[in-house]
Regions:
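Short, structured motif recognition centered on aromatic/hydrophobic residues
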Residues: 104-106, 132-136, 172-175, 261-265
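Active-site-proximal cofactor/substrate-binding loop regions of enzyme domains
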Residues: 71-79, 87, 93-104, 108-116
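Amide-forming acyltransferase catalytic core, primarily the GNAT-like/NAT-type
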Residues: 5-92, 163-259
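Conserved acetyl-CoA binding element of GNAT-fold acetyltransferases
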Residues: 101-121, 258-271
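Conserved small/polar residues in nucleotide/adenosyl-binding loops
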Residues: 321-323
């Protein structure tokens, strides 16, 4: 068992002259950005810049006593003692999945590719574990943490297992490139296509309750405002006007480091026959032509996987959801 990481604000520091403290963990600051030039970190630069910009208004709101949703937690691990330009050894981005901060997601956990070549560099597993445990330590109000890992990433799987995470769900990752010349499919009557707004957001919430597995639904503990905030105003619903019920929906979740957007597609269990032109229309409304959408499908949902394959989406491996 690794020794606990001691937290101080804004950094986790030991005696810099001690060989037992080869690196410091601290929250992301502006001066870190030029140091994050390792290939492992470059795809995250837009996200990191946006996080720093958003931290300013959140700080002002907090100073004025105004309640605001919690922002992302970004931690960096850097060399603690060096006579040269310090090297960033690792980076972690964690994000609350609801406004109350009861559930957090390990969105990114990356280690510098060049760090292994440095003399006396700490073990990569030690850096990763320290970042994860420090993030958990800095969010004492969190009840649950969620993390995903590729089924082929044995180091990440071992890291999660050693820190108490248990696999709960296996999903397949898909990437779909929206064709430039493909026309929008037609929508069958009597369903109505509506953009996601605060007025119809309760319909999305009821749809999520019907489609999300009960154990995961309890952990996520998402409310209407959580769904609206996470989508950033980018979402579409298919509504049955006779019942005033959303039978399918698609919304943004996050920008994907590989380009494009991660989206969530929900189809009511009683309306799986909509997998086809109707759900394709939802996805096409989310992004312009030529863009890329990233989706997850449960490995037990054969109908959805078959539809995505017919749509021309490419498989990008299996992802194991840990809680």
């Amino acid at each position: 068992m690794l020794p606990p990481v001691r937290a101080e604000s804004p950094a986790v520091r030991g005696d810099p002259r001690s060989p037992d403290t080869p690196f410091i963990i601290e929250r992301l600051q502006g001066w870190h950005l030029p140091l994050l030039d390792d290939p492992a970190f470059l795809p995250l630069h837009p996200l990191l810049q946006r996080t720093l910009l958003l931290s300013v208004p959140r700080g002002l709101a907090s100073a004025l006593g105004r309640r605001q949703s919690m922002g992302a937690l970004v931690l960096v691990a850097r060399e603690s003692m060096t006579a040269r330009r310090p090297t960033i050894l690792g980076l972690m981005v964690a994000r609350p999945l609801n406004r109350r901060g009861s559930t957090w997601d390990v969105e990114h956990l990356r280690l510098a590719l060049a760090a292994a070549e440095l003399p006396a560099s700490p073990a990569r597993s030690h850096i990763a574990s320290s970042l994860l445990r420090e993030a958990i330590h800095q969010v004492p109000g969190a009840v649950s943490w969620i993390a995903s890992a590729s089924s082929l990433d044995h180091n990440r799987l071992a890291l999660l297992r050693e820190n108490g995470f248990q696999p709960q769900r296996t999903e397949r990752l898909w990437r779909w490139s929206i064709g430039d010349g493909d026309p929008l499919p037609c929508l069958s009557v009597p369903l109505q296509l509506r953009p996601l707004q605060r007025r119809n957001a309760p319909l999305l919430w009821h749809l999520e309750q019907a489609t999300c597995p009960a154990p995961l639904r309890q952990v996520l503990d998402r409310r209407i405002d959580d769904l609206l905030e996470r989508s950033g105003g980018h979402g579409w619903l298919l509504i049955d006007p006779d019942r005033n019920e959303a039978v399918a929906g698609a919304r943004w979740i996050a920008d994907h480091p590989g380009g494009g957007h991660q989206v969530e597609l929900s189809v009511h269990p009683g309306w799986n026959h909509l997998l086809g032109p109707a759900t394709e229309l939802l996805l096409r409304r989310l992004a312009p032509k030529g863009d890329q959408l990233w989706l997850l499908s449960d490995t037990n949902d054969e109908a959805r996987q078959q539809w995505l394959a017919q749509l021309g989406a490419e498989e990008h491996g299996l992802s194991l959801i840990h809680i």
